[in-house]
Amino acid sequence: MENGNGKMEFCMKDPLNWGMAAESMKGSHLDEVKKMVAEFRKPVVQLAGKTLTIAQVAAIAARDDGVTVELAEAAREGVKASSDWVMESMNKGTDSYGVTTGFGATSHRRTKQGGALQKELIRFLNAGIFGNGTETSHTLPHSATRAAMLVRINTLLQGYSGIRFEILEAITKFLNTNITPCLPLRGTITASGDLVPLSYIAGLLTGRPNSKAVGPTGEKLNAEEAFRLAGISSGFFELQPKEGLALVNGTAVGSGMASMVLYEANILGVMSEVLSAVFAEVMNGKPEFTDHLTHKLKHHPGQIEAAAIMEHILDGSGYVKAAELLHEMDPLQKPKQDRYALRTSPQWLGPQIEVIRSATKMIEREINSVNDNPLIDVSRNKALHGGNFQGTPIGVAMDNTRLAIAAIGKLLFAQFSELVNDYYNNGLPSNLTGSRDPSLDYGFKGAEIAMASYCSELQFLANPVTNHVQSAEQHNQDVNSLGLISSRKTSEAVEILKLMSSSFLVALCQAVDLRHIEENVRLAVKKTVSQVAKKTLNIGVDGVLHPSRFSEKELLRVVDREYVFAYADDPCSATYPLMQKLREVLVSHALANSGNEKDASTSIFHKIGVFEEELKGILPKEVENARASVENGTPAIPNKIEECRSYPLYKFVRGELGTELLTGEKVRSPGEELDQVFNALCEGKLVDPLLACLEAWNGAPLPIC
């Protein structure tokens, strides 16, 4: 913190920063995500060195022309003071690392040519490989480069690095005009900082002939063209002593990419909670798994919040009410509990949310840190030689985040597998097939195979990076963080989790529509069975009330019990359970009516054939009419999802994106629908409908009563 004179004053009430770390974790994760989204959408990022957020980094990275960077003018004095100190120190003959000495393991060398030393630093660090770009790109994505530029400016603004303010202004102009230096994808161990990639930013600033940049429309630029388009009229910079080191000796590339990754990971964490609740809805799950007492007794805040969010989605849901009625029928013949992928989803997701949230705070501390060497302490008139360039917080945070992402993906895969499996999904068709003829529709079978592939790759990526450290630079950099490598692997993991989340969301929407068809077809079948029963079973041939009339209620209970999609493609087939169970009811009544069975006028056995023939003449047509009414938008029963808190997600996928029920009768493939949802997720279009599902949540679980 700063005192009234603008000098840094470190808080002695919390000298170890644990209090600040704990304070930053107050409040719900959802509120934090909402705050991130709001920050991401702001048009200006104001840099002062100490208040940068991962959302702001993600915004600069992703929104090429929608956001502007502004530097705090108040920082100019401190930046200038450290720059002046370096020049004065060198003029006095003070020996300082990287100013009068060589670098790393060769720091025993000495020189008085400070400017030439910085020039050589940039030259020898330009050791990256880009390739010809025809097959595989070895260039860091320009979004990650923009993130690195922003984070490096933020560090250097704090006035401990010995660099001119004008250089920071030049990098800012590159950002604001969408001029992006080309950095190599690989070649850094993030200790001593991200030396190799950051040297290419310095190379552009100094006009090195090998430096390249990309313009606003993707055009390739040399240094001269980049300066002209950015409006930097001062010409290429001749680096002063320490300035090259200030530019390259930092963790900005690793922490910049980590910020981008964590912005998405936090949103995907919330999405996994909502998708798990929708999964419970379409699976006819029992909602008691979200009861607050269960989770309060476990104590973990991530679990408690995950359960409370799911509880909020399920509270008042029409699916939950229907499921309660379903579970009341024949309760002893059904599992008492749902499977783990549903029932323990809060316990599974909670720790992952905690890990992602903790990693977010760790990276936010890193992007607001001073992480080069040496540090210039003007107030004490000294250069401090330390190791803040060691990016261990990045490597550790990213390894942990990747584990959490893999765990979330594993849960989504388990849920997806249950959803498409008719042994487990409580009446939905196998593979979620939507056609009238399931023998010519295999629904989401291909998507399930793809999900297995995604999940396998994601589990492999969960392996840690930070235990693969190699001693580098003549054993001077004998331990190093591998921060950027871990960030890159976590970025890959996030992409795969987005593939899985998109696939699962489309499958859930398919399940919602199938439940809607199921409900309308069941109603049509009940009406038809009731109508046929009254016509054929109530009155005997002599006009007298027939004993079989008492079977109607049991016949309707059969319709309630039987899974619609077990017979819907051929409702009167003798090999399907509906007709078999209806016949069983009539046979049992006939057996109980044994005394009257010899008389044709009172025999129930004689009525069975009449009932079945009448049903065969009407039922297939009524089932088709019910299905057609759903497809035409005129169903007898509206879609339950419209009254549910999860509706905004469904509405977006079906309404905004224009997707529809997938069937083998149509040409459209699952991949076409999945692509639409995936692209929308990547573009951030799913954020608003996702948060709309939780708009009414007050941040607390339902009371225990």
Swiss-Prot record:
Tissue expression remark: Expressed mainly in roots.
Pathway the protein contributes to: Phenylpropanoid metabolism; trans-cinnamate biosynthesis; trans-cinnamate from L-phenylalanine: step 1/1
Subcellular location, record wording: Cytoplasm
Cross-link position per record: 5-imidazolinone (Ala-Gly): A191-G193
Catalytic activity reported: L-phenylalanine = (E)-cinnamate + NH4(+)
Residue sites binding (E)-cinnamate per the record: N249, Q337, R343, N373, K445, E473, N476
Superkingdom of the organism of origin: Eukaryota
Documented EC number(s): 4.3.1.24
Region forming the signal peptide: none
Entry's family note: Belongs to the PAL/histidase family.
Function: This is a key enzyme of plant metabolism catalyzing the first reaction in the biosynthesis from L-phenylalanine of a wide variety of natural products based on the phenylpropane skeleton.
Protein name: Phenylalanine ammonia-lyase 2
Source organism (scientific name): Lithospermum erythrorhizon
Lineage of the organism: Eukaryota, Viridiplantae, Streptophyta, Embryophyta, Tracheophyta
